[in-house]
Regions:
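Conserved ABC ATPase "signature" region
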Residues: 109, 128, 132-155
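Catalytic Walker B motif of ABC-type/P-loop ATPase nucleotide-binding domains
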Residues: 184-188
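Conserved catalytic motifs of ABC-family nucleotide-binding domains
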Residues: 180
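ABC ATPase "signature
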Residues: 244-245
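Conserved ABC ATPase signature
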Residues: 159-163
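Helical segment within the ABC ATPase nucleotide-binding domain
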Residues: 199-212
């Protein structure tokens, strides 16, 4: 049974100045797949990310939500090691990213619709190329299993540039799972896909969270999708986490008719939400 949580997270600067990762109860004795503690990223004196703390547990799918400019992409880029935090700590499967970058990132992978694979290579060539980069053992068997999981075996020898958007997304997800990551980051993975294809991919991603020993951090602007897929959501605005909880319960807790209405309120009136949390 999926855990349901409806707690609110106080933004930094309030009574609880950022919830420490150690304060977050673990689902089991193992460390969370992602632990972010008081993370800050500053550009020119402005905090794009302002002291956020959260965790992603095993088998959990967490939605990172917020309007454009809220700090979502900056947060993901810090977790991926693309950006260096101004302050704070990131641990992936218990490994501190700053202290042991290679070992931490070896447990991670990423997929997004805006990051397609080289179109001049076939599906098989792409998966072999990235599999070698990731030093995947028994690579051919791993590729065969992922081609079957995402129903793309018939495209094995097709160049990725000739595939449809949905087919390319399936290949990107297969690539992201080659190294069996403990932490999978998905940035708008079903954007621009037709409803049937998006539904099938959501089901496949949900199965990954259930069947593996990892967790998933998912960003999306599709609130229907988030409500259907995510166990927990974090609402980010102006670099701060304003709300956290079960996406099916949060709207009623804050007098909103839907998750979409609550999203709009957070985007337009973050100070009002912040005051309500007080």
């Amino acid at each position: 049974m999926r855990e349901r949580r409806g707690t609110l997270r106080a933004p930094p600067g309030l009574a609880r100045k950022g919830l420490a990762v150690n304060d977050i109860p673990a689902a089991d004795a193992a460390p969370p797949v992602l632990a972010v503690e008081r993370l800050v990223k500053t550009y020119g004196g402005t905090n794009a990310v302002d002291g956020i703390s959260f965790a992603v547990r095993r088998h959990e799918l967490v939605g990172l939500l917020g309007p454009n400019g809220a700090g979502k992409t900056t947060t993901i880029n810090m977790v991926l090691g693309v950006l260096e935090p101004t302050a704070g700590a990131i641990a992936i499967d218990g490994v501190d990213l700053a202290r042991d970058r290679a070992r931490a990132l070896a447990r991670t992978n990423f997929a997004a619709v805006y990051a397609p694979l080289p179109g001049n290579l076939t599906v098989l060539q792409n998966l072999r190329f990235f599999g070698r980069i990731y030093s995947v053992e028994r690579l051919e068997a791993r590729i065969d299993a992922l081609l079957e999981r995402f129903d793309i075996g018939r495209f094995r020898h097709t160049k990725c540039g000739l595939l449809s958007s949905g087919e390319q997304t399936r290949v990107c997800l297969a690539k992201a799972l080659l190294n069996e990551p403990t932490l999978l980051l998905l940035d708008e993975p079903t954007a621009s896909l037709d409803p049937a294809t998006a539904r099938d991919l959501r089901e496949a991603i949900r199965a990954v969270a259930r069947e593996t020993n990892g967790g998933i951090l998912w960003t999306s602007h599709n609130m229907y999708e988030v409500e259907e897929v995510c166990d927990r959501v974090l609402f980010l605005s102006q670099g701060r986490i304003l709300l956290e909880g079960d996406p099916r319960e949060l709207p009623a807790q804050h007098g909103a008719a839907s998750l979409e209405e609550l999203f709009i309120r957070v985007a337009r009136e973050p100070l009002g939400i912040e005051g309500a949390v007080r």
